[in-house]
Amino acid sequence: MTTKEYFDYIVEQIHSTVVATVDEDGLPVTCVIDMMYADDNGLYFLTAKGKNFYRRLKDKGYLALSGKKGEDTMNCTAVSVRGKVREIGQDMLPLLFEKNPYMLEIYPTEESRKALTVFQIYEGSGEWFDLSKKPIERDSFTFGGAENKASGYFVTDSCIACGSCLTDCPQSCIELNGKAVIRQENCLHCGNLSLIHI
């Protein structure tokens, strides 16, 4: 999937996400925030200027969010995004209200919307995790010019192709073709292989 497709999934399939910010003491604070719109430039949501959430966004300019869709653990997909945010003001409010008409029940008049403002998550990275597939499926993505940092586990040149890693992998995502190769798109990142030093 493309980054835009992940964003669309967040907005259309998950919508209400758990967002983490940091308070003035450096402690984490979470709240549930609806992701209301996505385009090629990021994710968009709104908040009111009187909220502590607004102050944390303005103070730190960064957030992390997670959301999941599914009835239970083995039938769910989850997406996490972390990145820089910026306030873009009220210009997009009409679009966000058009795309999310339930907001008219919360803020029914123009006057009641005076304190609302839109934020954009414009640069960062994310992860996709799908436990409904066998083996599991995972992916990572970046947007807004963020650097793509390699994560997970990789086989080193010290691998002697003994095959001992094959039984330790809970998702059977290791292939032995000369030396072991981990299929990153199916890896749980459990750490089992780091214990056998491949």
What are these regions (language model features)?
Residues 15-49, 55-57, 63-69, 76-81:
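Short beta-strand segments
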Residues 1-18:
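Extreme N-terminal tail/first-helix region
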Residues 123-130, 134, 151:
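Intrinsically disordered, low-complexity linkers and tails
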Residues 143-161, 172-189:
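Ferredoxin-like iron-sulfur electron-transfer modules
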Residues 196-198:
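Conserved small/polar residues in nucleotide/adenosyl-binding loops
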Residues 118, 133-150:
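Flexible glycine-rich active-site/ligand-binding loops centered on an Asp-His dyad
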Residues 164, 192:
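A short, cysteine/histidine-rich metal-binding "knuckle" motif
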Residues 52-125:
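Short, structured beta-strand-loop surface elements
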